[in-house]
Curated annotation (Swiss-Prot):
GO terms for molecular function: 2-C-methyl-D-erythritol 4-phosphate cytidylyltransferase activity. This is 2-C-methyl-D-erythritol 4-phosphate cytidylyltransferase. InterPro entries: IspD, IspD/TarI, IspD/TarI_cytidylyltransf_bact, ISPD_synthase_CS, Nucleotide-diphossugar_trans. The record marks R174, K230 as: Positions MEP for the nucleophilic attack. The record marks R28, K35 as: Transition state stabilizer. GO terms for biological process: isopentenyl diphosphate biosynthetic process, methylerythritol 4-phosphate pathway. Signal peptide: none annotated. The lineage of its organism: Bacteria, Pseudomonadati, Pseudomonadota, Gammaproteobacteria, Alteromonadales. Pfam families: IspD. It catalyses: 2-C-methyl-D-erythritol 4-phosphate + CTP + H(+) = 4-CDP-2-C-methyl-D-erythritol + diphosphate. It comes from Idiomarina loihiensis (strain ATCC BAA-735 / DSM 15497 / L2-TR). PANTHER family: 2-C-METHYL-D-ERYTHRITOL 4-PHOSPHATE CYTIDYLYLTRANSFERASE, CHLOROPLASTIC.
């Protein structure tokens, strides 16, 4: 077991920086603006997500990967953000945007990176602290995730069904199945190499843990939260909007 002095020395060595991929269009939201720029109480979801990540003082800098097409949304946004938040040019895919941010973080001296979704604004501080604690000390990294609770069904894949109704092929055993969330925390250079090795355009690269798994790592699963919901569909936005408004009211009272 490490002594207190050894643990303190290790914390001095570690340099944690965050990467938030925010270059996506969010087409499934059926909104006229990218989902990360949807507003709740005069603030964007991206601002809430950045604020959530910065609740842990160990996060030294935040690199937000954005698209040039989002320039109009960034003009005012840049004025309201802390100086430790920086924008970098993202790519056409999530993985390309993450890779761009990780490369900048590494160039700035990051030993570890924390990757968080731009449209996951209700991250609890307790969960953030837990995943950072494990991610910094576990060489395989760590991610937030929640055990799958509902029954899972595999659908029959048929292109000849004229009714358009999808039918069940079989049930899937949910034992040992977890639903991945973010943040995901890894050694910075190791994650960069993993994404480059797997290929940023590989369709199987759905999150950072996928790249690490591709290279033989088994990241730790840290219990997340149902509130740590990613806005993907309109009903998701309704949920996080209500939570954020409730939190804002609590802070005012």
């Amino acid at each position: 077991m490490k002594s207190e002095s050894e643990s303190h020395a290790q914390s001095q060595i570690d340099s944690l920086m965050a990467v938030i991929p925010a270059a996506g269009s969010g087409s499934r939201m059926q909104a006229n603006i990218p989902k990360q720029f949807l507003m709740v109480a005069n603030r964007t979801l991206l601002e809430y997500s950045i604020e959530a990540v910065l609740k842990d003082a160990r996060v030294e800098q935040v690199f937000v990967a954005v698209s040039d097409s989002n320039a109009e949304y960034l003009i005012e946004l840049k004025k309201s953000l802390p100086t430790k938040v920086h924008f970098v040019t993202g790519g056409n895919s999530r993985a390309e945007s993450v890779l761009a941010g990780v490369k900048v973080a590494v160039s700035q001296g990051a030993t570890h990176v924390l990757v968080h979704d731009a449209a996951r604004p209700c991250l609890p501080k307790k969960a953030l602290t837990a995943v950072i604690n494990t991610g910094l000390k576990d060489p395989q990294g760590a991610i937030l995730a929640i055990p799958v609770r509902d029954s899972l069904k595999r659908a029959v894949i048929s292109v000849n069904d004229e009714t358009g109704v999808t039918h069940i092929e079989s049930s899937v055993d949910r034992e040992a199945l977890w639903q991945a969330q973010t943040p995901q925390v890894f050694n910075a250079e190791r994650l960069q190499q993993a994404i480059e090795h797997m290929g940023a355009l590989n369709p199987q690269l759905t999150d950072e843990a996928s790249a690490m798994q591709w290279c033989g790592f088994q990241p730790a699963l840290i219990p997340g939260s149902i509130r740590n919901l990613k806005v993907t569909h309109p009903e998701d936005f309704e949920c996080v909007r209500d939570w954020l408004l409730a939190d804002n009211n609590d802070h005012k009272n």
